[in-house]
Amino acid sequence: MKDPEIQEKGSVQKALMDKKESAYKKYVSLFVGKKGIWQFFKYECIILLFSWIPGAIGLFLRKIFYPFLFRNVGRGVVFGHHITLRHPHKITIGDNSFIDDYVVLDAKGEEDRGLFIGDNVIVGRNTIISCKGGSIHLDDFVNISANCSLLSESLI
């Protein structure tokens, strides 16, 4: 087995193994994306308070509070429960889109391109959409079935 210091590592592994960074800074870098205590506090409070609530009350509360995390959210967007968000400030969601339960929206990466979800898009339950340095653009009226994975290191 290769020495971990010599072995090539991806950006996530480099961030996690960096002994110079605190656990807080690693977490902010991997999940929140934007630096600063206000961004961290806002992200943590909204996720902690509203991500797990089922039913109509949860849908209503997420509709009000989740848009504060994103780059832009259109009208009539529905957020299911237990959605995982990474770097939500790089995510744009168009009008009348539906993000089902247990979806992962990951716009992590060095560049600021991120994830664009158009109008009237449905993202099915347990789907992972991940931009690892690339970007993903889902045009209007796209329907992604349940349990799918879309991963990009360039452009989809």
Model-derived features with residue positions:
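Short, functionally important structural connectors and interaction interfaces within domains
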Residues: 65, 75-77, 85, 148
